[in-house]
Design a protein with these regions (language model features):
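N-terminal Sec signal peptide cleavage junction
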Residues: 19-21
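Polar, glycine-rich mid-to-C-terminal structural blocks
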Residues: 214-262
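Cap/lid segment of the alpha/beta-hydrolase catalytic domain
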Residues: 126-147, 155-162, 171-179, 388, ...
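Non-catalytic accessory segments flanking enzyme active sites
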Residues: 44-143, 154, 242-303, 308, ...
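Blade-edge beta-strand/turn elements of extracellular beta-propeller
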Residues: 119, 170-182, 224-238, 274-284, ...
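Asp-box/WD-like beta-propeller blade repeats and closely related beta-sheet repeat scaffolds
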Residues: 118-140, 150-155, 159-196, 200-211, ...
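Beta-propeller blade signature
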Residues: 105-109, 166-171, 213-224, 271-276, ...
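Active-site-proximal cap/loop segments of hydrolase catalytic domains
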Residues: 496, 502, 509-710
């Protein structure tokens, strides 16, 4: 079969080369056979490519040491255990060398604050997988409030987004005998009561949207067969986004509300309130999200202006509406503003405690957390928690039975830590810090700005050695994402620190348009046919690094995944002169067929659609797969993906690599067989992928004699 694949590849060579010589994009597609995720021919091609890449990267004298360091850090016993409040205790999911798939465990707050917490195992996924001969990967839990004793556990086959759901009792630590069980699927669920849940899933074959997500919500009672579940809401098969989803909010006073979110596009959705006898649509902007509830007031995070209150509430703000009023008059909500960010601010998240709100705010890409409380006249006061400055901060979890919250603090050179906050007093204290993984004293962090092609100032962080000589010789990795209003903020990354910074490398994170660093407007500036500004921003940062002699094209590498993988592909084809290494992670690359591959149709709101002529023309102009040129001098990229990725899919990466092969262009390709939309299903697989990446960067950007120093 391998010979058949090789023969077909070379038979297509002349066609590919001929098409690749035109000035415009090459819209031919001779590698659709690689779109079969698990097809025999496709998998044989994958195995051949994996073996070829292994002979290059794993044979490098640096690889073994890099892999060992990555695995040791991934499985270290003194890693920081992040926890969440559940039933009066703290729960954590943990993986190490003895628990490859992981254990779900718990401890008390007092014990967690000690140097050596006493953990009780609630569920051992390794033991469960062995007993059931299943390839289980933990995907989380949803526990019924109040009490939080009964939980719906999500278990995935190999890391896919699709999962199996089973009810579990955390007190007895057993699956519930008459519990809820939902077979494998992309599904959404919400507790209505201890004996009733709402479920959105593919009830009958084909009852999914174009993107493969559910659009029908049914009520399922304990002991009731799936076939007998009662439909309460139906969207449409033509809906965009990520599927119709139910969600239940409960506050400390016992107020309870179940909502249904119906996505119409990637960023727009209708919000509905489940009432005793019907499901009523709420008068909330389509670009907004219901996020929590406190004291009978429902929190909404806005990406569009909301009118209807005393004054218009701007996009990017946080607002509330009264639940009791919504139950009476869902179509005439009167919102109150809680917080409206300034021009260089954004809201990263909102959480409720018993009677306070915690707002995660970024000011010029620096984090802080504000405690908000409501006065009797409806005004809100905000007090910052006393947290470190010039770092990233965020709320990990809150306890609605009290005013406690767990807050994360992290920075490029600041080991991640957990802080315990008291929202009623607006105080916070560090209670757990991860052990340093690299010598941060050798490095320094700067925040700088580049000027994009249209004059926009684009901030970026640069982490470099103390006393760095600006002579263009510094090996540099530039990272960005640039899409979906996702913010890239400073964080302590042990792999980057140990495997790159300690080895003398420079790391750069760019806050380009398309992200959410400065609110919805920063994101919307790069939507659909306006997307070229995202790529111009990234190139501007690279050119600034070169102009200031931090690095040079010979020493500059770039990295990005998923939508960031598309960014990498565009930079690879538009500006091959700027880079000597391009790490393309789980990417989108065929932008003329992305709507037909996996969940791609759900992202039309971000990228546009080939069904719209203007948008198709733009997509063709940027699509990396269609803009490869035979005879062009490209750097050798590392392209990697995963077989089990049922979100973006491995098809984009496979086809891009195959086309490069047919054109006689140098490349390295690796496909992880498990792991979903990520680097692997367990620590060993993830460490292997990480080692391949940093070995690749060392080969491309550092001198051959430069050895890895553990």
């Amino acid at each position: 079969m391998r010979h058949l694949i090789r023969s077909s590849r070379y038979a297509l060579l002349a066609v590919v080369l001929a098409c690749g010589q035109s000035d415009g994009p090459d819209i031919s597609d001779n590698f659709q056979w690689l779109e079969s995720m698990h097809g025999d021919s496709a998998m044989a091609w994958v195995q051949t490519e994996n073996a070829r890449t292994a002979t290059v990267l794993e044979a490098d004298p640096r690889y073994a040491s890099i892999y060992k360091a990555a695995l040791d850090m991934a499985q270290a016993e003194d890693r920081l255990p992040y926890v969440s409040f559940l039933g009066g205790e703290l729960y954590n999911f943990w993986q190490d060398s003895a628990h490859v798939r992981g254990i779900w465990r718990r401890t008390t707050l007092a014990s967690y604050r000690s140097a050596s917490p006493a953990w009780t195992t609630v569920l051992d996924i390794d033991s469960l997988a062995r007993a059931e001969n299943a390839n289980w990967v933990w995907q989380g839990s949803d526990c019924a409030r109040p009490g939080e004793r009964r939980c719906l556990l999500m278990l995935s086959d190999g890391g896919e987004d699709a999962n199996t759901v089973r009810e579990f009792d955390v007190v007895s630590r057993t699956f519930v005998t008459d519990g809820f069980v939902l077979p494998k699927g992309k599904q959404r669920l919400a507790w209505v009561s201890l004996d009733t849940i709402l479920v959105s899933r593919e009830w009958e074959a084909g009852e999914v949207t174009t993107s493969g997500y559910p659009f029908i919500v049914k009520r399922l009672a304990r002991g009731q067969a799936l076939a007998d579940a009662v439909e309460i809401y139906r969207g449409s098969a033509t809906d965009g986004g990520y599927g119709v989803s139910p969600a239940t909010l409960v506050d400390a006073k016992g107020n309870r509300a179940t909502f249904i979110d119906r996505p119409l596009s990637t960023f727009e959705s209708e919000k509905h309130l489940v009432r005793a006898t019907d499901v009523a649509q709420l008068s909330i902007p389509r670009k907004a999200g219901i996020v929590d509830m406190v004291d009978g007031r429902v929190l909404v995070q806005l990406s569009a202006e909301w009118t209807g209150g005393a004054a218009p509430i701007p996009a990017g703000a946080v607002a509330v509406f009264d639940l009791a009023a919504a139950l009476r008059e869902p179509g005439t909500l009167v919102p109150e503003v809680v917080f409206a960010p300034g021009p260089r601010e954004s809201v990263a998240g909102v959480s409720a405690t018993r009677d306070r709100l915690l707002l995660s705010i970024y000011q010029n890409v620096r984090g802080t957390v504000l405690v908000a409380s409501r006065a009797a006249d409806g005004t809100w006061t905000r007090t910052p928690l006393p947290l470190p400055e010039n770092v990233s901060t965020g709320v990990i979890d809150t306890d609605i039975t009290g005013n406690q919250a767990l807050v994360s603090v992290t920075g490029f050179l600041t080991p991640s830590s957990v802080w315990l906050a008291d929202a009623s007093a607006a105080t916070a204290a560090e209670i757990k810090t991860m052990a340093p993984r690299f010598d941060a004293t050798r490095s320094v962090v700067e925040q700088r700005e580049a000027t994009s092609k249209d004059g926009t100032k684009v901030p970026y962080f640069i982490v470099h050695p103390q006393g760095m000589v600006r002579d263009g010789s510094n090996p540099t990795i530039l990272y960005a994402y640039g899409g979906f209003e996702a913010s890239m903020t400073p964080r302590y990354d042990a792999d980057i620190g140990k495997l790159w910074l300690e080895q003398g490398g420079v790391y750069v994170m760019a806050n380009i348009r398309g992200g959410g660093e400065f609110g919805p407007a920063w994101h919307e500036a790069g939507l659909k046919t306006k997307r070229q500004v995202i790529y111009d921003d990234f190139a501007a940062v690279a050119e600034d690094l070169i102009a200031t002699e931090v690095t040079s094209p010979r020493r500059l590498g770039i990295q990005g995944g998923s939508n960031g993988g598309l960014l990498m592909g565009v930079q690879f084809t538009q500006r091959p002169d700027l880079w000597n290494a391009v790490d393309i992670q789980v990417p989108l690359l065929d932008m003329l067929r992305f709507e037909q591959i996996q969940a791609g149709a759900s992202w039309v709101g971000e990228y546009g659609s080939v069904s719209v002529p203007e948008e198709r023309a733009f997509l063709a102009s940027i699509s990396p797969y269609h803009n490869l040129r035979a005879g062009t001098k490209y750097p050798e990229p590392l392209i990697w993906t995963t077989t089990k990725d049922d979100r973006v899919g491995p098809q984009h990466a496979r086809k891009f690599a195959a086309k490069m092969s047919a054109m006689g262009l140098p490349y390295l390709f690796h496909e992880v067989i498990e792991g979903g939309h990520g680097a692997g299903a367990n620590a060993a697989q993830q460490a292997h992928t990480t080692a391949l990446e940093f070995t690749y960067f060392a080969r491309q950007l550092m001198d051959p004699e430069k050895q890895f120093v553990p």
